Amino acid sequence: MRPLTPRQAEILELIKRNIADTGMPPTRAEIATRLGFKSANAAEEHLKALAKKGCIEIMPGTSRGIRLTAEVEEVTETGLPLIGQVAAGEPILAQEHVEQYYQVDPSMFHPAADFLLRVKGDSMKNIGILEGDLLAVHKVQQARNGQVVVARVDDDVTVKRFEKKGNVVYLHAENEDYSPIKVDLGYQSLTIEGLAVGVIRNGDWL
């Protein structure tokens, strides 16, 4: 199966969820409404692209004429995992943290993404990372000053700009309403979970 754009991956996930929840695929109008398209025709164009990439089959003459291909059904749990609520003390990529998978090519990011994290809050809004965005993350354990990281501080996961001075780490927000998080490595726990390598907003690249 050819790599999908984030918007195509979002539509494919919507189709999968609708089939799982209701037993049938969504109509073009339903896709347009849920994803904010101006018309069902816009949804139709994306469906044609998914068909060309071998993800779905379109059956003409019916509003719900969408069928997942066998290849897509076999790879439901592949692609980039979207990480939801992270339990204290558990690895961030533990299976129980995965909400769903997006069929997005990891190599479209540089370095390649290992997982997606849904952004909560507006502490990084000044650099275009907004609440509800999907942050593409490259898994690493160390960071350089100035990099935007996903960090775990005493089991709280946060996205901030990294700065280390001696034995103290400052996690800086990109929003003047938030003060830096100071982490004294002498007695506090800090784990770097990865580097931010891209953002998906409403299914579009930024």
Curated annotation (Swiss-Prot):
Q: Which UniProt keywords apply?
A: Autocatalytic cleavage, DNA damage, DNA repair, DNA replication, DNA-binding, Hydrolase, Repressor, SOS response, Transcription, Transcription regulation
Its GO biological process terms?
DNA repair; DNA replication; negative regulation of DNA-templated transcription; proteolysis; SOS response
Reaction(s) catalysed by this chain's protein: Hydrolysis of Ala-|-Gly bond in repressor LexA
Residues marked Cleavage (site) = A88, G89
> Which CDD domains does the UniProt record give?
S24_LexA-like (cd06529)
Domain of life per record? Bacteria
EC number(s) stated in the UniProt entry for this protein: 3.4.21.88
Q: Name one GO molecular function term.
A: DNA binding
Q: Which residues form the active site?
A: S123, K160
InterPro entries per UniProt: LexA, LexA-like, LexA/Signal_pep-like_sf, LexA_DNA-bd_dom, LexA_repressor, Peptidase_S24_LexA, Peptidase_S24_S26A/B/C, WH-like_DNA-bd_sf
Oligomer status and interactors: Homodimer.
Q: Do you know which HAMAP family this protein is assigned to?
A: LexA (MF_00015)
Q: What exactly does this protein do?
A: Represses a number of genes involved in the response to DNA damage (SOS response), including recA and lexA. In the presence of single-stranded DNA, RecA interacts with LexA causing an autocatalytic cleavage which disrupts the DNA-binding part of LexA, leading to derepression of the SOS regulon and eventually DNA repair.
User: Can you say what this protein is called?
Assistant: LexA repressor
The organism is Shewanella baltica (strain OS155 / ATCC BAA-1091)
Which gene name belongs to this protein?
lexA
